[in-house]
Amino acid sequence: MAEAYKQAGVDIEAGYKAVSLMKQHVQKTMRPEVLSGLGGFGGMFDLSSLGYREPVLISGTDGVGTKLKIAFMMDCHDTIGIDCVAMCVNDIVVQGAEPLFFLDYIACGKAIPEKIAQIVKGIADGCVEAGCALIGGETAEMPGMYDENEYDVAGFAVGIAEKSKLVTGSAIQAGDALIGLASNGIHSNGYSLVRRIVFEQAKLALDRVYEPLSVPLGEELLKPTRIYVKPLLNVMKQFEIKGMAHITGGGFIENIPRMLPKGLGAEIDYGSWPIPPVFDLLQEKGNLLRHDMFSIFNMGIGMVLAVDSEMIHPVIARLEELGEKAYLIGRVKQGEGVSFAGGAMS
């Protein structure tokens, strides 16, 4: 039976080997609340020891998108999993959640055990950084659906928060300050446009260093998404964070309004933080307007926090103590939308 399945394109033995290779990576993510081992039908997590009075579960799911195409071209698969975790846990921490556990889904044209193990290593690295356990997943070999050397990765995170400490944005008011946390480059959004600019318009090579970059283009494009969970959870224990926005697809223009109450908007001080050079390269080669860049990419800010104006300096100081690069980037204003002040948006 296994041989007949193999002739149809599904190698069961390769799947077993992949599971064996990934076990060491999964094990390092374990938390004491995990009651199940790798290979069960479902993952089990005991909430009873966490001590919440009114626990609220917060979940998020996401994938890596067409950034995967760069990984295929570079034959580099050990950081894509970090991206997958980051996209999920950053989305739930903005509501005040501590990530508890994570599950992944990998679909591929051909199960190459060593490649699957590399992907899972990245997922496990991301889980360790976020403090959550990798309690389950699925690797689906799907010949005819994907090319042999291609795959897709998605994930699902579940976190918990005390009901009274949920971060909803409802307390935000005009005059509150906006603090931005530095990104690690492009992160995981906008890669369909990135690939169009790089390969179709500018015809750039991934192994070359282009001004103003300091590393080969492929290395720059594969930099993993920053995971902000631990510093944000730490800061929330000391200060009231009124709202948070994970800057993903849609950039500043779409994501900052998602945390704001109706009738309020944001004024951003253009030039108040350093914009990574990769965005200058993409703007130049893609012949894009600066405003367009801010509606697509994170432009060097991966997370935005809304705090009382009196809390600016202590919050930034604490974030910097935790290793974050934090900037006062603007303020909340009356009137909806995102506007820019202080520089030419050319």
Swiss-Prot record:
Reaction(s) the record says it catalyses: 2-formamido-N(1)-(5-O-phospho-beta-D-ribosyl)acetamidine + ATP = 5-amino-1-(5-phospho-beta-D-ribosyl)imidazole + ADP + phosphate + H(+)
Molecular functions (GO terms): ATP binding; phosphoribosylamine-glycine ligase activity; phosphoribosylformylglycinamidine cyclo-ligase activity
Pathway entry: Purine metabolism; IMP biosynthesis via de novo pathway; 5-amino-1-(5-phospho-D-ribosyl)imidazole from N(2)-formyl-N(1)-(5-phospho-D-ribosyl)glycinamide: step 2/2
GO annotation, biological process: 'de novo' IMP biosynthetic process; adenine biosynthetic process
Enzymatic class: ligase
The encoding gene: purM
PANTHER family assigned: TRIFUNCTIONAL PURINE BIOSYNTHETIC PROTEIN ADENOSINE-3, TRIFUNCTIONAL PURINE BIOSYNTHETIC PROTEIN ADENOSINE-3-RELATED
Keywords, alphabetical: ATP-binding, Cytoplasm, Ligase, Nucleotide-binding, Purine biosynthesis
Protein name, UniProt field: Phosphoribosylformylglycinamidine cyclo-ligase
